[in-house]
């Protein structure tokens, strides 16, 4: 029986001696690797924070003390220790544990996260609320060096330092993005700063010197000038000192006694304090240590080797990367921009082939969009590759800096629609709705990976802002054309003719419509199928033609219904006076979509062939009753 078997709650953790925590850390790593190998998830980030999380929960008293996890990629140990060990096997599964902190799941998840760089702002708000209420608790924000590149984090640091609020920020530095400290003197000064005697001794010495007649103030000034010169040897720490934080570190994030010591010291600091902790991403699992980027977020894998199952089909992301390289070979104006997602957006091949035309701006989506606008002004064709959910963070820049000026910026929106196991914070189900109202913007969504290639060709040749939205995962396995052509803007594609009802689908719902039409034909209902291709502008002529022809429409989209593609079709019919046409909208309801396998989520929310078939059959029965009603009246 291991130590972990006896851990059900934080009280069990605190009953252990500090010497037992390293053994517990090893057991936690084994559990995480075993579980994530089956469920998928964020492996390397969690392996890197095992000791850090143990130390935090050993010193701080959650839930009374607040611990906010930035992004949430690294919350697995936290979940195991806070009463959810028995559920950990359900991680990221439908109706199981979320892969991110979730306030609805546990009182220990004091703030929900999923997007980056929010923790310090939230923690500062909690700290201010504590002070306003006259309460006494610690508030801790845990943020990675990658997330610290987000502007919002610096905005929060700036105000926290200005206010002098008692707040602890733990910088989990696992990539050495912040410069290494320089030389022996820097290490010495760092050791001084981690000693609680340092601040007290400094104040006592200053007080003593000020009381010495004549020479005291001069000596004090001389010491201050030396200190000001030396302190800039501690490159990273001085940035935070200048912002008003007490800087403690750097600390070995896998040395539990050192972290227990520094966290206790941080509790004693009056005012904001930043604890700089150095960790190794993927720690304790050789494949993840060797390739932490690959194991940042993974699907199921063989824990013995780290190998993942292969799929002969290519993903939409891979098609994007290949196609953009192909297009850029022929057009030197094409540039690629990503916000810290080079691999995730498929831009690895582009970055290697065209390093001078590739820009990774870090976690700075707003900057990425306006950077693209500036490049477009000067005649380039920038392609901003970004997950749908993260474009939400740059909405004003899309409107104000790109679309208002009608600049030729391409938005390649990966992970559009239901993303799956990453859950509520990552589902890309709002983009149709928030982009459709924007003037000057064209928006497309492909039915398969081959059409996607042609849409990319269309996008880079368009003389204005344009977005193409595509799903996560593999495509249909269709053949890929070698020669690409630009599609006519706003032109739909008719895939099937029928007189009984029309199915108008967009994006990855088109194959669902085609399959449903085949089943309906077997049941005596002939359906027209239209691949809309464009959310904006709509093919008004095509839609109105089939509305008049069949009198019944079903729209299909993997987006919220409110303000989405189906709503656009309804608005068109009203504008054209076709108010007698019956329209049924199949899409997502007015809720945040939880985590789970995409096929289970689609089944729950009715984005299925069966739902389309049942809806069409119901419309046929209604039509039959309407035809019968006048006869009964006679």
Curated annotation (Swiss-Prot):
UniProt-listed InterPro entries: Dxylulose-5-P_synthase, THDP-binding, Transketo_C/PFOR_II, Transketolase-like_Pyr-bd, Transketolase_C, Transketolase_CS
GO cellular component terms, A-Z: cytosol
Cofactors demanded by this protein: Mg(2+); thiamine diphosphate
GO BP terms in the entry: 1-deoxy-D-xylulose 5-phosphate biosynthetic process; isopentenyl diphosphate biosynthetic process, methylerythritol 4-phosphate pathway; terpenoid biosynthetic process; thiamine biosynthetic process
EC top class, as a word: transferase
Amino-acid positions noted as binding Mg(2+) in the UniProt annotation, renumbered to this chain: 145, 174
UniProt binding sites for thiamine diphosphate: 73, 114-116, 146-147, 174, 285, 365
Signal peptide: none
Enzyme Commission identifier(s): 2.2.1.7
Note accompanying the cofactor annotation: Binds 1 Mg(2+) ion per subunit.
MF GO annotations: 1-deoxy-D-xylulose-5-phosphate synthase activity; magnesium ion binding; thiamine pyrophosphate binding
Annotated catalysed reactions: D-glyceraldehyde 3-phosphate + pyruvate + H(+) = 1-deoxy-D-xylulose 5-phosphate + CO2
Keyword set, alphabetical order: Isoprene biosynthesis, Magnesium, Metal-binding, Thiamine biosynthesis, Thiamine pyrophosphate, Transferase
Pathway field: Metabolic intermediate biosynthesis; 1-deoxy-D-xylulose 5-phosphate biosynthesis; 1-deoxy-D-xylulose 5-phosphate from D-glyceraldehyde 3-phosphate and pyruvate: step 1/1
Function recorded in the entry: Catalyzes the acyloin condensation reaction between C atoms 2 and 3 of pyruvate and glyceraldehyde 3-phosphate to yield 1-deoxy-D-xylulose-5-phosphate (DXP).
Assembly and interaction partners: Homodimer.
Family: Belongs to the transketolase family. DXPS subfamily.
Protein name: 1-deoxy-D-xylulose-5-phosphate synthase
Gene that specifies this protein: dxs
């Amino acid at each position: 029986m291991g130590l972990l078997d006896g851990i059900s709650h934080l009280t069990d953790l605190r009953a252990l001696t500090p010497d037992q925590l390293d053994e517990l850390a090893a057991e936690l790593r084994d559990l995480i690797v075993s579980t994530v190998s089956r469920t998928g998830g964020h492996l390397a980030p969690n392996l890197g924070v095992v000791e850090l999380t143990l130390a935090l929960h050993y010193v701080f008293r959650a839930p009374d003390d607040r611990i906010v996890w930035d992004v949430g990629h690294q919350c697995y140990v936290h979940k195991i220790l806070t009463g959810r060990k028995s559920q950990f096997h359900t991680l990221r599964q439908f109706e199981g544990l979320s892969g991110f902190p979730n306030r609805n799941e546990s009182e220990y998840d004091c703030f929900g996260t999923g997007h980056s760089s929010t923790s310090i702002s939230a923690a500062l708000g909690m700290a201010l609320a504590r002070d306003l209420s006259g309460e006494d608790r610690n508030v801790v924000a845990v943020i990675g060096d990658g997330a610290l590149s987000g502007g919002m984090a610096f905005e929060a640091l700036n105000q926290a330092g200005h206010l002098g609020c008692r707040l602890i920020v733990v910088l989990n530095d696992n990539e050495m993005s912040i410069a290494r400290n320089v030389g022996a003197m820097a290490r010495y000064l760092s050791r001084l700063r981690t000693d609680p005697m340092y601040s007290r001794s400094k104040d006592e010495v200053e007080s003593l010197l000020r009381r010495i007649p004549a020479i005291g103030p001069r000596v004090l000034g001389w010491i201050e000038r030396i200190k000001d010169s030396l302190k800039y040897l501690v490159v990273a720490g001085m940035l935070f000192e200048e912002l008003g934080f007490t800087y403690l570190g750097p600390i070995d994030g896998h040395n539990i006694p050192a972290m227990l010591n520094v966290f206790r010291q941080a509790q004693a600091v009056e005012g904001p304090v930043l604890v700089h902790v150095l960790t190794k991403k993927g720690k304790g699992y050789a494949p993840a240590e060797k390739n932490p980027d690959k194991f940042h977020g993974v699907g199921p894998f063989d824990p013995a080797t780290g190998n993942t199952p292969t799929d002969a089909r290519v993903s939409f992301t891979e098609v994007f990367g290949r196609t953009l390289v192909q297009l850029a070979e022929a057009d030197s104006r094409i540039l690629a921009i990503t916000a810290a997602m080079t691999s995730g957006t498929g831009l690895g091949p582009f970055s290697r082939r065209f390093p001078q035309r590739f820009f990774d701006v870090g976690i700075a989506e707003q900057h990425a969009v306006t950077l693209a606008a500036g490049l477009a002004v000067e005649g380039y064709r920038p392609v901003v590759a970004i997950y749908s959910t993260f474009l939400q963070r740059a909405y004003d820049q899309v409107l104000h800096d790109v679309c208002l000026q009608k600049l030729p910026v391409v938005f390649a929106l990966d992970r559009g629609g239901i993303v799956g196991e990453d859950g509520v914070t990552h589902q890309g189900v709002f983009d149709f709705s928030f982009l459709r109202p924007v003037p000057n913007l064209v928006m497309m969504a492909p039915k398969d990976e081959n059409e996607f290639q042609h849409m990319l060709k269309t996008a880079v040749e368009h003389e204005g802002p344009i977005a193409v939205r595509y799903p996560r995962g593999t495509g249909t396995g269709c053949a890929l054309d070698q020669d690409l052509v630009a599609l006519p803007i706003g032109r739909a594609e008719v895939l099937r003719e029928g007189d009984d009802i029309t199915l108008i689908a967009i994006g990855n719902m088109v194959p669902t419509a085609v399959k449903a039409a085949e089943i309906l034909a077997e049941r005596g209902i002939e359906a027209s199928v239209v691949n809309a291709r464009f959310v904006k502008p709509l093919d008004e002529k095509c839609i109105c033609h089939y509305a008049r022809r069949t009198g019944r429409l079903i729209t299909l989209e993997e987006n919220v219904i409110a303000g989405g593609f189906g709503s656009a079709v309804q608005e068109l019919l009203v504008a054209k006076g076709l108010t007698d046409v019956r329209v049924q909208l199949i899409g997502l309801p007015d809720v945040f979509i939880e985590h789970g396998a995409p096929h289970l989520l689609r089944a729950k929310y009715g984005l299925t062939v069966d739902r389309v078939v049942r809806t069409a059959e119901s419309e046929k029965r209604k039509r039959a009753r309407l035809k019968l009603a006048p006869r009964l009246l006679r």
